[in-house]
Design a protein with these regions (language model features):
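Acidic, surface-exposed loops and disordered segments
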Residues: 1-173
Length: 173
């Protein structure tokens, strides 16, 4: 339920800068600046044309399996996670799904010795307005979830701090 856009366009970067306070340094210094988009509510409903396309054309499921999966997904969306209780709930869930590849991208970058940072520090409404007006994506099918910057930072910056393992980890036997 995601799409990734490598944003190289300097004009667009300058337009979003005033509204992307968490990306100020990254917009200048990062060698790669990626927008992570989440699929829209209309595409992520259990009965959407998009999910039908994924199951039929991409996953090549037979029709009877598609119907079974659609019903399981309906139950998940309606009952398990109650994603239809508000307009925002389904989009929030879809945006959470984008954090799975985001985490993998951050980890892969670290393994390769590339610095990276995830970015949520931006005015979503204003940044989306700019990206949509510039034709970066179609708001009928996508919404901006977060951003990520890749590159090499100045090594003289303050080191990261972390809480003790015992404060964040619990074992239940």
């Amino acid at each position: 339920p995601w799409k990734f856009i490598l944003l190289n366009n300097k004009k667009i970067k300058e337009k979003i800068r005033p509204y992307a306070w968490g990306a100020e340094k990254a917009l200048d210094g990062a060698s790669h600046f990626v927008l992570i988009l989440a699929r829209s509510n209309q595409d992520m409903r259990y009965d959407s044309d998009y999910l039908q396309y994924i199951m039929k054309e991409v996953q090549k499921f037979p029709d009877e399996m598609i119907e079974q999966r659609r019903e399981k997904f309906r139950n998940f969306q309606e009952n398990d996670f109650k994603l239809f209780e508000s307009e925002r709930a389904l989009l929030d869930w879809t945006c959470k799904q984008t954090y799975i590849p985001l985490a993998n991208m951050l980890t892969a970058a670290a393994i390769l010795g590339v610095d990276s940072t995830s970015i949520e520090g931006f005015n979503k409404e204003k940044v989306e307005e700019i990206l949509i007006s510039e034709g970066v994506y179609d708001p009928e099918h996508f919404r901006l979830s977060c951003m990520i910057a890749f590159g090499y930072t100045n090594r003289d910056h303050r080191p990261k701090t972390r809480r003790k393992l015992e404060e964040v980890w619990q074992l239940v036997d």
